[in-house]
Amino acid sequence: MEQIEQMAKEIERKFLVDQGLLPKKIIGEEYIQAYIAINDQGIVRIRIKGSIALLTIKTSEKGMTRNEFEYEVPLEDAKSLVELFNDKIIYKTRYKITIDKKLWEVDEFHKENKGLWLAEIELESENESFSLPEWIKKEVTGDQKCFNAYLSENPFKFWNNE
């Protein structure tokens, strides 16, 4: 039996975005994410971006570091899973912006989460320093409401003016 490698550590910080201050000519990619399992231990999701489909497992941990493991899966299988788990879906456009050699992933949410914009930056360590772009409003790292899994069950449109 093949030995499974240890899961990769994901260290990221998350922020609310003022979309009016974003660069004007950025190109995004459409994402569909269906959540297969969400519980206190973590999440299992299927993601479709273009012709690529990924099955992701993330553990639930406090702070900005989590375990993450990701597998590419056949696109048709992913589409079937999205249809099966169609009650917990996120639709978004992801824009990638590099600032000071660091990649920012900015998500514009659609449908039930329209109006919400979030940015993430992955870091090498929890203490790594980086520059905040002018379009960052507020840090929301660790705020469960800003996790995609939470948004799949509690859409932004139902939040009370937050």
Language-model-detected regions and their locations in the chain:
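Phosphate-end processing signature that detects enzymes handling 5′-triphosphorylated RNA
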Residues: M1-E162
